[in-house]
């Protein structure tokens, strides 16, 4: 059926900020879909609140609205644009929920807007637990016995009839939020109570636990002519019971018989046909390992995390085709873009194995609850491709960037057997490494399978890896064993470790004996047809399929998995850099390991290598491609850390040189550079042990900011107020050494701001200055940033511009750099300089209309700013006000404190833009899900040093009609200054303490600051946790509360009797 001509304008809803459970895969899907619709001649209107994505670039849609995804704003845009249709299946759960809300609200009917791709009834049938159950019964598809409940009592009654363990699944929440496994009534009571609160319809499903079954997923497509096919099936290494987003996944499935595969394939196709979905759909099933019994777990009637993985694993572009199907095209009339010759109506065949491993944030959250269950905790993921399971698994392990280069964490050797087995049974984020350690200790695959329900097939593979380790250890320098190890994915570093030699010597031995990888093409058809995709993976085998072109090439290193501190912003810069390389006439090659992102879409670059970002893997590609040089400044710390080893190996680093990167990152060299340039910085010293640190702090004077050198996202950074806290920090938080000193700086409480600058070596373009709302001490990635600055004097702005130019020229910066300043009493100090693209690049590019990463790349390749038409210095300001606000994922991470400080905690960002600061702030708060009603109660629990300032805020809250509550000390202070606040207990005062007020819905906002003694703050942590769990806006910085007040004041009216 040809495409529809009765619709011209289509609205696409994006997925908003990146949170755990909804990451960059939707930027990838949304970008593909918008371009796919434009390609067919439709006008595309996009709404998304996330500035950090490629999807919200002007070129992606005809009209791009970076506005909050809320009923209020989307309705406005619908009325203004009047689209003919809405495509809701590409914006994750956020997009789906928004579409449902618009539909229930009646606005779509009023404007005559129709749904494309998936009918509303199908979304309801897949998402609403009751309707889903009815549909499965009609199709005679087995589902675990379950009951829908609206109260805790109903849950307990049902569990009594089927027996424990049971699983709780709240309706309409994302990534399993609020759900969990319950072994007894106490756990059931706790989890159901929380789940009912988090479900927008106060509804939970209680179901029989089928933990221990194999978890299998099918990614299926269907069109309006009822053609349906399976793109890919996937098998979780972890059995049912761990959220699929937190599981290690292999594609294609490895342990099913042909009969089982056909059985589950038929089930999946019958479900997508019954739901009449036009587009992509994901079906999750549980298979009993001991019989042919299976259950349908759930169906996602939209593009999902798994479909991004399936697209990258097979090369079959699901989102692109889903968009074409949504407008009426059928699978047998769309050409498969991979082969360019076959149609999309065929099932991809794979002649390789793909492994996906999730990336967790627990390196940043040491206190976080690491036990895995039905609620997702990973922030990102890596994928690796190999010719066997061992190879793809080991390549994925070294892609994770958690300091491992094999399926082994050396520290685990010291763990006792009992502790080891407990971790093997009770899965944490690092279970793979514990299981591998158990095998090294002689536990058999059978014993471990019994304990974990992991299929023995995978455990045998781990045993095989261990056997190769032993072979290597027994035969140093043996070429045959070396070949075997390389065929199974071993890194040079692991081999060097077992041989007691260096990585470099292993590499030399390989090169001398021509043991080098070949590159194979991902072609969707197991080489059955000719293919034209430039998408490759390495393996040690025969016949290299990646042919070097005659054109000069440039290699761009991506940023690897998404984690806190290094998010999708760096992928954004990578993609823009590629566009500029191509425009300059070079071949652009990308190397990256993240399946969720736009940069690993094979149509973005001239060549894509899906490989780990390690020295060995990068050098292998360089040896083959011989590029003109490598660009490292867009891949975050991942790529920057590779600059030095690559340069030592004789590779040309394009842009700022390694020696200059070092001058910005190495403390002593940096201080020296600032002295030479006559730029002030807060007084500070380096320390290599506890005594040196104490001495430095006494000299500088408390408070001090302490942190390790060379980190991204403020890992292990703290503000300490006294020597006792400093000593405990040095003992527990960091492993200081002469190689890894700790920086001790005077902590200046001032206004913080940052600048991104682009330099060609002679001139410096400063697109804009961003002012932070939170004062210094909150990590820049967790601060709200305002552009253009609202409170900085002309003199301060000129000083900032002057220092920026001096630094860029003085540090020989070529390309991008980011500088953070703190201002106190009109004096400007430099806090830090990053000689690379930073996380503010997408935001600043969008609000200034300067494609910063593209400009930087053109300068790196030899053009000058004047040739590109840019002047030297600060770019003229925009007249509108733009705010970048952080978004957090605390609801997903139990035991992680939501208190803001110098260590970054946000997972994503939103943008609010309008004519005034207050309006822009309102949008930013709305977009980041911080919605404050216009009346209610606000609680203050404030540290002594901030009570004075909090008093002023409390008065202003009272003036606009809020009731003021406060904890004992704060209430007494307020009373002594003439403000009566209702006293409320902190913790443990039964039904009079803050958490119980929160549970009863009597509190609309909490303002909680923490004093200098962090130790005494367990109460505060419980208060903050209760706010997070009940969705009550929480402010741990008075500046953020002040910004919210400005919004409320601008929206409130004074009513007074005459």
UniProtKB/Swiss-Prot annotation:
Keyword Oxidoreductase carried by entry: no
Binding site for Mg(2+) 1: 284, 298
SMART domains, alphabetized: CPSase_L_D3 (SM01096), GARS_A (SM01209), MGS (SM00851)
Binding-site residues, Mg(2+) 3: 820, 832
Sequence segments annotated as region (Carbamoyl phosphate synthetic domain): 547-929
Pathway field: Amino-acid biosynthesis; L-arginine biosynthesis; carbamoyl phosphate from bicarbonate: step 1/1; Pyrimidine metabolism; UMP biosynthesis via de novo pathway; (S)-dihydroorotate from bicarbonate: step 1/3
Binding site for Mn(2+) 4: 832, 834
Residues covered by the MGS-like domain: 930-1058
GO MF terms held by the record: ATP binding; carbamoyl-phosphate synthase (ammonia) activity; carbamoyl-phosphate synthase (glutamine-hydrolyzing) activity; metal ion binding
Residues binding Mn(2+) 3: 820, 832
Binding-site list for Mn(2+) 2: 298, 300
Region (Oligomerization domain): 402-546
Residues that coordinate or bind Mg(2+) 4: 832, 834
Domain ATP-grasp positions: 133-327, 671-861
GO cellular component: cytoplasm
Keywords: Amino-acid biosynthesis, Arginine biosynthesis, ATP-binding, Ligase, Magnesium, Manganese, Metal-binding, Nucleotide-binding, Pyrimidine biosynthesis, Repeat
Superkingdom field: Bacteria
SUPFAM superfamilies given in the database record: Carbamoyl phosphate synthetase, large subunit connection domain (SSF48108), Glutathione synthetase ATP-binding domain-like (SSF56059), Methylglyoxal synthase-like (SSF52335), PreATP-grasp domain (SSF52440)
Assigned EC number: 6.3.4.16, 6.3.5.5
Subunit structure: Composed of two chains; the small (or glutamine) chain promotes the hydrolysis of glutamine to ammonia, which is used by the large (or ammonia) chain to synthesize carbamoyl phosphate. Tetramer of heterodimers (alpha,beta)4.
Function of the molecule: Large subunit of the glutamine-dependent carbamoyl phosphate synthetase (CPSase). CPSase catalyzes the formation of carbamoyl phosphate from the ammonia moiety of glutamine, carbonate, and phosphate donated by ATP, constituting the first step of 2 biosynthetic pathways, one leading to arginine and/or urea and the other to pyrimidine nucleotides.
Domain notes: The large subunit is composed of 2 ATP-grasp domains that are involved in binding the 2 ATP molecules needed for carbamoyl phosphate synthesis. The N-terminal ATP-grasp domain (referred to as the carboxyphosphate synthetic component) catalyzes the ATP-dependent phosphorylation of hydrogencarbonate to carboxyphosphate and the subsequent nucleophilic attack by ammonia to form a carbamate intermediate.
Protein name listed in UniProt: Carbamoyl phosphate synthase large chain
Gene: carB
